[in-house]
Amino acid sequence: MTSAQVGDTGLILLVPEVEPAIGRWREQYDSVAPLGVPAHVTVLYPWIPAGRLTEADCDGVAEIAGATDPIELTFAAIGRFPDVLWLDPQPSGPILALIAAVTARWPDYLPYGGQYGDPPVPHLTVADTDPDQLGAVVADIEQALPISSTVGELSLVVRQAEGWSFDRRFPFRS
């Protein structure tokens, strides 16, 4: 989401329970945090541009979300990609199933454009800078782990000129 253009959209899982442990680090090191995106796991980005998004598309997301049980996640480990420090959501199976359902419905849209594998590794970004320079951040976050969360909805975010905004929320099956 770092090179996003106005009108870009994404489908994300919000994880507010991790904010006390990582919020200050995200504000400092995650380029999307200051733009209004809270702690999250990305399901699909980029998705249909806002100007082409239809009610039928949103109905499709609502259908997928409505068939999805709430997802119980535990964040107990920190992972690293080149230039990314992240929390590992476990179990990842329900997230991967959600990614599969969304990409099956919209096969022209792969997570991250297919750049990081299909499907990519589910993760919650803490910092998008060289992780090897973040020893103090890692030590601080490790003290707060594990963190548990129940995710009960999928959120549609849209890139505006001033940052990201929430367009809709699609509740999971209750």
Where are the predicted features?
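Basic, often amphipathic N-terminal segments
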Residues: M1-E72, S92-G152, S165-S174
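Conserved TIR/SEFIR loop-to-helix hotspot centered on a Trp-containing motif
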Residues: I78
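Short acidic/glycine-enriched loop/turn segments that link adjacent beta-strands
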Residues: F81-D83
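Short histidine-centered catalytic/ligand-binding loop motif
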Residues: W86-Q90
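Short beta-strand segments and strand-loop junctions that repeat across beta-rich extracellular domains
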Residues: G152-A161
